[in-house]
Amino acid sequence: MMELLVVSLSLALAFFALLDGWYLVRVPCAVLRARLLQPRVRDLLAEQLYAGRVLPSDLDLLLHMNNARYLREADVARAAHLTRCGVLGALRDLGAHTVLAASCARYRRSLRLFEPFEVHTRLLGWDDRAFYLEARFVSLRDGFVCALLRFRQHVLGTSPDRVVQHLCKRRVEPPELPEDLKHWITYNETSSQLLRAESGLSDRKDQ
């Protein structure tokens, strides 16, 4: 019995010491909670909320929430969002999946220790290759938007149009993308062209 306990504790210690253990636990839990315990969201463009709180493990040397933590919290919220609106299920039905191809973050005000916040996630639209999502970190103390993140979720194995059509049972025209998002997409395309030219891969497309 004691040997089993030691082995179990050793495996748990190795899991959290060698891997990003809490992340690997939280994402599946968020997906299962969204699938089993929360109602389905029929409106693809509806905003969804994911609650959080700044913990000691989230802090940087200035005792603010580490900038990298915003991306991780947004990742968990995005997984729950895509589950509730049915996108992940549709991708699975079509034998496809998505990968994060690009992201950008704008930090407006620090989140401090134990400060409660919500991640407001919404789908902004899609093109022939990717979905575009936004995550806003809103402080529950005063409603201030502390950070704004944008994501390009590239679809592999099918197209965003087919995913939406599978969900809605009809063809749906994508909404007009915000002007600032269009500029970001242009930046990504220009950056890709420059990097491909530097690598001698001008005919190869990025994700």
From Swiss-Prot:
Question: Tell me, what's a Pfam family for it?
Answer: 4HBT_2
Residues annotated as glycosylated: N188
The primary location reported for this protein is: secreted
InterPro entries referenced in this protein's UniProt entry, alphabetically: HotDog_dom_sf, THEM6_lcsJ_thioesterase
Cellular compartment(s): Secreted
User: What keywords would UniProt list here?
Assistant: Glycoprotein, Phosphoprotein, Secreted, Signal
Annotated signal peptide: 1-21
Q: Which residues carry this modification: Phosphoserine?
A: S199
Q: Which GO terms describe its cellular component?
A: extracellular region
The UniProt similarity line reads: Belongs to the THEM6 family.
**Protein name stated in the entry:** Protein THEM6
Gene name for this UniProt entry: Them6
